[in-house]
């Protein structure tokens, strides 16, 4: 059982190392969604801390907006209100999936020129 766990961990680490920034963000949202579904305050909070730490304040307006949203989610989780955080994380995940799809579509169009 321990060997299988080590293999699984190694595979996950390798997968994460090959993801682009948008894919990493989507993975973080997936982890937050899972934690909220399980009502796991510790993991949900840890995901939100990672999301906050990943903000790029070179883009002040969007970073500040996301910071306020993540901070709000953190407070709601501390109150035991996982449902609103779950909804927000799902919506943000969907948005970033659309961004990823748009970037891939644009890359394909550019490469076919």
Predicted regions and their residues:
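Surface/interface-facing alpha-helical segments and adjacent flexible terminal/loop regions used
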Residues: 1-53, 57-113
């Amino acid at each position: 059982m321990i060997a299988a766990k080590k293999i699984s961990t190694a595979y996950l680490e390798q997968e994460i190392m090959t993801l682009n920034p948008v894919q990493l963000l989507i993975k973080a949202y997936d982890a937050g969604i899972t934690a909220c579904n399980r009502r796991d305050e510790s993991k949900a909070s840890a995901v939100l801390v990672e999301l906050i730490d990943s903000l790029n304040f070179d883009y002040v307006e969007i970073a500040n907006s996301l910071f306020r949203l993540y901070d709000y989610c953190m407070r709601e989780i501390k109150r035991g209100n996982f449902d609103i955080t779950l909804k927000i994380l799902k919506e943000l995940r969907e948005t970033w999936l659309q961004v990823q799809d748009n970037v891939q579509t644009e890359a394909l169009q550019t490469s076919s020129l």
